[in-house]
């Protein structure tokens, strides 16, 4: 026998996988290899993509899984950070998924073959391959990867987190502003003051200047550390106590500032019952102040833990555009004679505009101080 040569074959992982795995680790997402390959082969691939880093990761074979009860497997998964499942059959995949679910995990399973269909169905999120996957696996899955790329899963996780964050930002902005309006009206009644905001002006705020920034917050880009936070508890509500307290105290602050400034202008112009000029000045000032405060509040709402200076004011051009349009609308309402007659507003001097802008910025300063001193405490 004459030795001619030795040939080896290798199916390397895609180039984007190591970076995607690193992102999942930072995001607190556990990744397991479940394969029919030989254990050391699976370990070598896992090391190559960064799924394991310890010297001796736990390798569980299909034969071992046969001897494990679901409870024991759940404990093994809990007590071992790095596990590789090798030489497994489709039935074993179902057992692994059940054990992970028993530990309270939300399980996403990838697969491309007919034999992966039961596991894809059992998982919370079944992910099939769009190119290499079979029709059966695609029908059994919840999501199909059009490019068969693991990196796309990570992108989907990031997009999901962005959507959830933006929903909270929208709720926070809307609730804090509406509470501010309620406090303004309620406080004025309790203090025996005339109405600072007429029904028409409230509608102008809620249906005019308030709407565009709220919509723009829905297309906010993700925060810098969005993929460095652990997954949230699936049972966690959007309106948790700290979140409610946060927008409630800001709403009270908004109401207090607007009511206080309304009272200040009434006194400044020596308001008495029937003094229409003094009332119009005070009401217009309160309205414009409320609009400007809400614009600052929209800037604050972009992040509950990061300074607006760190995020950058112009990274969301939609929001900046919405704020400019809202301010322009408010300016027209106060300064155009035709609209003054309809809305019950009056002209403000340059000094009054500057004073209002300065007063409105207090909410921005307050939130910047909170973020610096109590980062994320009320998020």
What is each of the regions a protein language model found here?
Residues 1, 24, 37, 42, ...:
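Residue-level signature of catalytic and energy-coupling elements of molecular machines
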Residues 1-99, 103, 117, 123, ...:
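Cytosolic catalytic headpieces and adjacent flexible linkers of membrane translocases
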Residues 13, 39-41, 92-94, 116-117, ...:
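Flexible loop/turn segments at secondary-structure boundaries
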Residues 14-18, 39, 70, 93-94, ...:
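Amphipathic alpha-helical transducer elements in NTP-driven molecular machines
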Residues 98-117, 125, 200, 213:
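Charge-patterned, long linear interaction tracts outside catalytic cores
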Residues 115-178, 219, 223-227:
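Mg2+-dependent phosphoryl-transfer enzymes with acidic/Ser/Thr/Gly-rich catalytic loops
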Residues 156-379:
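C-terminal transmembrane helices and immediately adjacent loops/tails
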């Amino acid at each position: 026998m004459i030795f001619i040569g030795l040939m080896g074959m290798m199916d390397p992982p895609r180039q984007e996988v190591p970076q995607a795995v690193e992102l999942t680790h930072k995001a607190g997402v556990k990744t397991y290899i479940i394969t029919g390959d030989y254990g050391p082969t699976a370990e070598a691939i896992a090391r190559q993509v960064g799924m394991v880093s310890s010297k001796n990761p736990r390798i569980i074979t299909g034969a071992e899984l046969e001897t494990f009860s679901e409870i024991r497997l759940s404990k093994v998964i809990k007590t071992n950070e790095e596990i590789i499942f090798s030489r497994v059959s489709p039935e074993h995949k179902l057992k692994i998924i059940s054990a992970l679910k028993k530990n309270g995990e939300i399980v996403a399973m990838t697969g491309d073959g007919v034999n992966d269909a039961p596991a894809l169905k059992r998982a919370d999120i079944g992910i099939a391959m769009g190119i290499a996957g079979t029709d059966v696996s695609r029908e059994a899955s919840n999501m199909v990867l059009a490019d068969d790329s693991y990196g796309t899963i990570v992108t989907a996780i990031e997009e999901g987190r962005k959507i959830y964050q933006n929903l909270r930002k929208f709720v926070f902005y809307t609730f804090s502003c509406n509470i501010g309006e309620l406090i303004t009206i309620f406080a004025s009644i309790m203090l025996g003051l005339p109405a600072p905001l007429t029904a028409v002006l409230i509608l102008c705020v809620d249906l005019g200047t308030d709407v565009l920034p709220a919509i723009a917050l829905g297309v906010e880009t993700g925060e810098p550390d969005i993929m460095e936070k652990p997954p949230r508890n699936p049972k966690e509500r959007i309106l948790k106590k700290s979140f409610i307290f946060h927008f409630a105290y800001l709403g009270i602050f908004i109401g207090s500032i607007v009511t206080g400034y309304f009272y200040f202008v009434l006194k400044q112009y020596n308001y008495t019952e029937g003094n229409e000029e003094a009332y119009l000045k005070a009401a217009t000032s309160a309205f414009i102040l409320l609009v400007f405060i809400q614009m600052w509040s929209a800037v604050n709402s972009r992040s509950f833990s990061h300074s607006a200076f760190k995020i950058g004011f112009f990274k969301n051009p939609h929001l900046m555009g919405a704020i400019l349009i809202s301010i322009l609308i408010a300016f027209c309402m106060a300064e155009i004679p035709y609209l003054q007659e309809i809305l019950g507003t009056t002209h403000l001097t340059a000094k009054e505009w500057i004073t209002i802008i300065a007063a409105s910025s207090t909410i921005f300063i307050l939130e910047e101080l909170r973020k610096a001193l109590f980062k994320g405490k009320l998020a």
